[in-house]
Swiss-Prot record:
Protein name: Uncharacterized protein C227.17c
The organism's place on the tree of life at top rank: Eukaryota
Pfam families xrefs: PANTS-like (PF11326)
Organism the protein comes from: Schizosaccharomyces pombe (strain 972 / ATCC 24843) (Fission yeast)
A Gene Ontology cellular-component term: nucleus
């Protein structure tokens, strides 16, 4: 399957959603600045009793919330940088997060996309 489209128009199909995201990152569309309040809230939510019990039930251990704290620290570090440098850092980080997410297991590992309707037998 071809991973890159030749034209710049947006695709309406789900299989090209990740490609559209890459194209947006390449075009230099300004990133929304990271919100300290959002990352702080995510970190605080991770530490709640309900979240910890839910994680313990699913994985057999408590969540140390390292990823949430790391995200909060990273967002805090962007606030002291110049606007252009912060924008470039945001673009790179979002692209890295997206690539890491895509490399993990997903439904495409199990299901094959149909190109024609299933024949009724």
């Amino acid at each position: 399957m071809n991973n890159f489209k030749e034209n710049d128009e947006k695709s309406t199909f789900g299989q090209y959603a990740e490609l559209d995201k890459i194209l947006d990152l390449k075009k230099g569309i300004p990133e929304d600045p990271c919100s300290l309040q959002y990352y702080f809230d995510q970190m605080a939510m991770c530490l709640t009793v309900f979240s910890q019990m839910n994680h313990y039930y699913r994985y057999g251990e408590y969540n140390r919330c390292k990823g949430n704290f790391k995200d909060f620290k990273w967002c805090l570090s962007t606030k002291s940088k110049a606007h252009e440098e912060a924008q470039e850092g945001l673009r790179k980080r979002r692209l890295q997060q997206w690539m890491k997410f895509r490399q993990g297991p997903n439904s495409e590992d199990i299901w094959k996309m149909r190109t024609s309707p299933k024949s009724s037998e």
